[in-house]
């Protein structure tokens, strides 16, 4: 099984840049991706523009957490030139970035348009710890008598029914009802899956309201990887009816996961603007 890759891109346009003096800063609005809050901070320091990516735990500031990630920040000019830097690091409450992202002269001469510039963050999460969600339904040992297989995901065990999962997912149908060795095993390990995302996915299948703007990235990624059509449909309905994500984000998700109804709604809204 191909690993689920937690990746996302977000942009922000900083305006009235000429007003920035030494020590002044701009902060982008926060965006929620994979249960974490993300924003970009830029600071003018003498003759440099500093640029940092920040991550925070939206659920609980009192719990120790970390996010290992690879990311880049990029600004581009109308002529096609760009400034971009790449970094690997661990977010644990402090921003990561550069105190010399681009010189102030270069920014004002090469990258400003109408006294503004747009910065893009491309992020790939490799590991998350300390992020939790409210449990809407338990799949722990208390469910043992209602299950026929234990799925080991990360350091958690989920007690579930093979036929139930097989009826919702072509992946589990092949795994449990096909000729794989897992069909006869009472405990199966699923590699490269986040247990928090898997918990949310199971809750969706059991009818719980587990989808929100914080969980949907992980649920949709996993549902697409495991071909769980019901969860994909529920995610699309949420994105159309309730999500607060930007039109840019919605269109990106529609294209990435072939969500044609969402794509149609987005295009219709754009055409009426």
UniProtKB/Swiss-Prot annotation:
Checking PROSITE patterns in the record gives: BTB, MATH
- Keyword annotations from UniProtKB, A to Z: Ubl conjugation pathway
Q: Where is the MATH domain?
A: 7-123
Q: Name the InterPro entries for this protein.
A: BTB-MATH_domain_protein, BTB/POZ_dom, MATH/TRAF_dom, SKP1/BTB/POZ_sf, TRAF-like
Pathway(s) per entry: Protein modification; protein ubiquitination
Q: Which CDD domains match?
A: BTB_POZ (cd01165), MATH (cd00121)
Q: Does the keyword Iron apply?
A: no
This protein's source sits in the domain of life called Eukaryota
**Which residues does the UniProt record annotate as the domain BTB?**
147-206
Q: Which SUPFAM superfamilies match?
A: POZ domain (SSF54695), TRAF domain-like (SSF49599)
> Partners and quaternary state?
Interacts with cul-3.
* Function recorded in the entry: Probable substrate-specific adapter of an E3 ubiquitin-protein ligase complex which mediates the ubiquitination and subsequent proteasomal degradation of target proteins.
User: What protein am I looking at?
Assistant: BTB and MATH domain-containing protein 15
Species classification: Eukaryota, Metazoa, Ecdysozoa, Nematoda, Chromadorea
């Amino acid at each position: 099984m191909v690993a689920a890759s937690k990746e996302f891109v977000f942009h922000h346009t900083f305006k009235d840049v000429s007003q920035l003096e030494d020590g002044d800063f701009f902060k982008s609005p926060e965006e929620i991706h994979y249960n974490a809050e993300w924003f970009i901070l830029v600071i003018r320091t003498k003759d440099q523009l500093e640029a940092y990516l920040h991550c925070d735990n939206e659920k609980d500031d009192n719990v120790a957490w970390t996010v290992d990630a690879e990311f880049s920040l990029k600004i581009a000019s109308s002529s096609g030139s760009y400034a971009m830097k790449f970094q690997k690091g661990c977010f644990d409450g402090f921003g990561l970035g550069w105190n010399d992202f681009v010189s102030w002269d270069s920014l004002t001469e090469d990258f400003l348009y109408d006294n503004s510039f747009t910065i893009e963050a491309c992020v790939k999460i490799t590991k998350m710890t300390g992020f939790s969600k409210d449990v809407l339904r338990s799949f722990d040992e208390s469910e043992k008598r209602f299950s026929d297989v234990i799925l080991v995901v990360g350091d958690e065990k989920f007690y579930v029914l093979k036929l139930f999962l097989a009826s919702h997912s072509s992946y589990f149908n092949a795994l449990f009802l096909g000729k794989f060795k897992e069909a006869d095993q009472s405990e199966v390990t699923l590699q490269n899956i986040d247990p928090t995302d898997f918990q949310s996915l199971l809750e969706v299948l059991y009818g719980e309201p587990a989808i929100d703007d914080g969980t949907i990235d992980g649920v949709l990624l996993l549902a697409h990887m495991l071909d769980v059509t019901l969860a994909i449909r529920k995610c699309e309905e949420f994105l159309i009816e309730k999500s607060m994500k930007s039109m840019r984000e919605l269109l990106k998700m529609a294209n990435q996961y072939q969500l044609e109804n969402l794509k149609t709604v987005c295009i219709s809204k754009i055409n009426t603007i």
